[in-house]
Amino acid sequence: MSTPSAPHGDLTDMKAILAKVAAGNALNEAEASLAFDIIMSGNATPSQMGGFLMALRVRGETVDEITGAARVMRAKAIPVEAPDGTIDTCGTGGDGSGTYNISTAAAVVIAACGVPVAKHGNRAMSSKSGAADVLGALGVNLDCDLGLVRKALWDARIGFLMAPRHHLAMRNVGPTRVGTRTIFNLLGPLSNPASAKRQLLGVYAKQWVEPLAHVLKRLGSEAAWIVHGSDGLDEITTTGPTTVAQLKDGEVTVFEIEPEQAGIFRARPELLKGGDAHVNAEAIRALFDGAQGAYRDIVLLNAAAALHVAGKAGDLKEGDERARHAIDSGAARAVLQHLVSITNSSITNEPVAAP
């Protein structure tokens, strides 16, 4: 796909852009779009790319810069058509927590409540099991035709969008390693190929909660919660309070929530620790078969928040009740089985059912 057609800033090449950021100056959105277009088109040298990313990192990326970069990521992505009302539950990763797969399990529960979920993700960054790892262990075919991803999204109400398959331009970035987090750690959750207009987005550091809400506002999101747990999780945590930046009706507000608001007891952090993909897959199967405990509680809390963002629950308590019913009725287990079945099927010319 072509990149955004909006006019760029005054800078016209990577050398000029690099000089500006190296001097400690911020780029405007158009200049940032130009820079990332150059990088993702393979027209920046490794040294230019590394220097640019580190200069942004040292100074601190701005809302303009993140927005401009995300526009390029979105424009270059291979898209997937999604139903109206689709939500994404995604995190930046990198929180180093090693928990069970929380947002992935919550995504299945949300879909079982009737809300389409375009789950955008990748393999593990900070744990032994990322979204792709655990879904693969559950039997989802991660290499299925993209037509089947679309079919799953419409028919099972959940599709897994494997980031490297949709963001081919990232191949031009992959060889560059600067040994620390960069803006690209933030861009994945902002670049859903299904153009989901509603997001529950977890971040690895509290400093990004409010800025990313403003980025999503600029990118046209209708509603979003950007969250960071007080224990460091890029999820809504059950061990204590969670900082939330809410995008609603074009306004961004920041507040804290507590698990008790959903009727959920606080948990000890060690009860959320997971294992490798197979251990975490078994935990998800047990959860959908009715297992109780801290893992169920944190999945319920995150699903409840997503249902609220999706406009399907007035508050966390109502969202929690809907999520509980989705698990206890067997609907979540059925959705997972449907997802596995579709991704392991053959492409047909049958029309995709509307939700």
Swiss-Prot record:
Query: Which molecular-function annotation in GO is an example for this chain?
Result: magnesium ion binding
List residues binding anthranilate 2. R177
Q: What's its EC?
A: 2.4.2.18
Specify which residues bind anthranilate 1 according to the UniProt entry for this protein: G91, N122
Catalysed reaction(s) here are: N-(5-phospho-beta-D-ribosyl)anthranilate + diphosphate = 5-phospho-alpha-D-ribose 1-diphosphate + anthranilate
Cofactor(s), names only, from the UniProt record = Mg(2+)
What keywords would UniProt list here? Amino-acid biosynthesis, Aromatic amino acid biosynthesis, Glycosyltransferase, Magnesium, Metal-binding, Transferase, Tryptophan biosynthesis
The answer to whether UniProt assigns keyword Aminoacyl-tRNA synthetase to this entry is no
Protein's pathway: Amino-acid biosynthesis; L-tryptophan biosynthesis; L-tryptophan from chorismate: step 2/5
Quaternary structure, per UniProt, is: Homodimer.
What is the stated purpose of this protein? Participates in the tryptophan-dependent indole-3-acetic acid production, which is a phytohormone released by A.brasilense.
Write the protein's name. Anthranilate phosphoribosyltransferase
Which organism's genome codes for this protein? Azospirillum brasilense
